[in-house]
Amino acid sequence: MKIRTIAILLLCMVFSMGASAYQTKKDMERIERLLADAQKLPKDSNLMLHFGKQFLNVPYVAHTLDLNMEEEKLVVNTRELDCTTFVENVLALTLCAQRGETKFTDFENQLQQIRYRNGKVEYTRRLHYFTLWIEDNARMGYVTKVESQYMPFTAVQHVKVDYMSKHVKDYAMLAAHPEWLEGIKDMESIITGNYYRYIPKKNINNSNILRQTIKNGDIIAILTKKKGLDTSHIGIAVWEKDGLHLMNASSIHKKVVIEPMVLQKYMEKHPSQIGIRLCRVVDLKKN
């Protein structure tokens, strides 16, 4: 009888998720608490930093979006984060809080718009490459690209992405659905051939010009020279006295941290990392 009761409860929980999303009651309660608490913050609060810090010490777990091999579902998981889902959750919370929204459904809808091209929940529309993530979220009016022809943006990235289509076995859902491959190739073709100015590793110092360029709470995309990829890691900018640090879901520390090392020193330990691109959350209150 007890086993049957548990089974019924589990089924109820699954159906309560709806047809398009996975989440737990804990996730829903946490999101609504965070959004309610944010309404009490001073108006000039840096919401990206505030919400990012609410996830400090949350465990790093990869592949949390690939729960259903049959079809893509919107996953809300605040208990386990990777570098991308950390940034997406923080951005979604920030945009909701700016609009004064406090309901989980508001957050869920915003996260869907951030994570998927044109907000359509499909594996081939998930913004797997962060270059396309930036382009799409800028087009949607959620972020602005921070770039310039001048210092410290002294280098240019020529994007050539095909890692997913060339390494299908590394992606469980894609390997299970070879019919999705053409959609992934189409996604890769959108950004392949594009050029973007970026801040090279050597320019990521504690200078006045860098402090003027990068603001607390900016989204930092670390670029890579690894063949077929555009970026290797993302996080949120945090300025401290000794320089620029990265708040991120770290596979090294196995949790969300503000990296103790300054970003330049961190990147020097990763020879394949060549520099950074930036985007900044739009201030909806000014629009």
Task: Label every PLM stretch briefly.
Residues 7-16:
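Bacterial N-terminal signal peptides
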Residues 215-287:
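C-terminal soluble interaction/assembly domains
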Residues 1-7:
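Bacterial N-terminal signal peptides that target proteins for export
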Residues 27-46, 65:
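Start-of-domain marker
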Residues 60-197, 239, 247-251:
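Acidic/His-rich structured neighborhood in mature extracellular/periplasmic domains
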Residues 17-26:
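Bacterial Sec-dependent signal peptides at the C-terminal "C-region" and cleavage site
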